[in-house]
């Protein structure tokens, strides 16, 4: 049985004061025991959040990590070993904003994925299509290619210690949301692609949906058989809203 997971991606939001307030709100939440809860603050605030959530069953992750496992001469980057030392357990790899705006390629993301795993940092691989790709009927082709990039480089068993988040780019921060059935169809295809390589890995990997998930639509999305939780953007910046989404996953 796959454990539900709700992960909050804070993106490039926060000041010391607002992060302290949000962290306090999260620490006061009554979270369902059966749900794995994680937050991904900006790198500058990782230590502050870890300290603020001490004793709380909330995992802290990073939004990005370097292409090499160890510290070294790579200006502006943070190495997986440094993130692990700080207390991170997870890292987002390939979020659409990094693919689309920063220009990260599958090759770069493969290196980041491997570097993270080499230091015991669990990757959350983000995959998804743009509106143009969906309208052209290329959703499964695009998602399949992004998934295959990792499988071809490292084998499907790389996903035995990873999470996959499907995030249709057109639904991120737009207020648009894939219908539960649209999301389920893609999640089923992802699990099917993995199962063609290794049924055991496919059955165990957590598949999250990301794309304007809110308390109002979370229960319906999470009720789908291949949706194991959510990667939450804007709604994760409100502790009460995030708590409601976590409870929806617990139900």
From Swiss-Prot:
One Pfam family, short name: TIM
GO MF annotation terms: triose-phosphate isomerase activity
Pathway: Carbohydrate biosynthesis; gluconeogenesis; Carbohydrate degradation; glycolysis; D-glyceraldehyde 3-phosphate from glycerone phosphate: step 1/1
Ligand binding (substrate): 9-11, 173, 212, 233-234
Gene3D superfamilies: Aldolase class I (3.20.20.70)
Entry EC no(s): 5.3.1.1
Residue stretches spanning the membrane: none
CDD domains: TIM
Enzyme category, top tier: isomerase
Keyword Kinase attached: no
Assembly, per entry: Homodimer.
Its job: Involved in the gluconeogenesis. Catalyzes stereospecifically the conversion of dihydroxyacetone phosphate (DHAP) to D-glyceraldehyde-3-phosphate (G3P).
Protein's recorded name: Triosephosphate isomerase
Organism from which the protein derives: Pseudomonas putida (strain ATCC 47054 / DSM 6125 / CFBP 8728 / NCIMB 11950 / KT2440)
Gene name per UniProt: tpiA
């Amino acid at each position: 049985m796959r454990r539900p997971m709700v992960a909050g991606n804070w993106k490039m939001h926060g000041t010391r004061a607002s992060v302290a307030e949000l962290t306090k709100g999260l620490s006061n939440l009554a979270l369902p025991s059966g749900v794995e809860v994680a937050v991904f603050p900006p790198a500058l605030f990782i230590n502050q959040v870890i300290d603020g959530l001490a004793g709380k069953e909330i995992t802290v992750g990073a939004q990005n990590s370097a292409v090499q496992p160890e510290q070294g001469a790579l200006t502006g980057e943070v190495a997986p070993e440094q993130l692990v030392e700080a207390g991170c357990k997870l890292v987002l790899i390939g979020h659409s904003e990094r693919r689309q705006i920063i220009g990260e390629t599958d090759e770069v993301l493969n290196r980041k994925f491997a570097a993270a795993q080499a230091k015991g940092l669990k990757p959350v691989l983000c995959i998804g299509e743009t509106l143009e790709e969906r309208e052209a009927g290329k959703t499964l082709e695009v998602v399949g290619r992004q998934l295959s990039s990792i499988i071809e480089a490292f084998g499907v068993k790389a996903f035995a210690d990873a999470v996959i988040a499907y995030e249709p780019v057109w639904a991120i921060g737009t207020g648009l949301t894939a219908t539960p059935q649209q999301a389920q169809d893609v999640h089923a295809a992802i699990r099917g692609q993995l199962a063609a390589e290794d049924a055991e890995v496919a059955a165990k990997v957590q598949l999250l949906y990301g794309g304007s998930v809110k308390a109002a639509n979370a229960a319906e999305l999470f009720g789908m058989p291949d949706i194991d939780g959510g990667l939450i953007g804007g709604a994760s910046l409100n502790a009460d809203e995030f708590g409601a989404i976590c409870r929806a996953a617990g139900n």
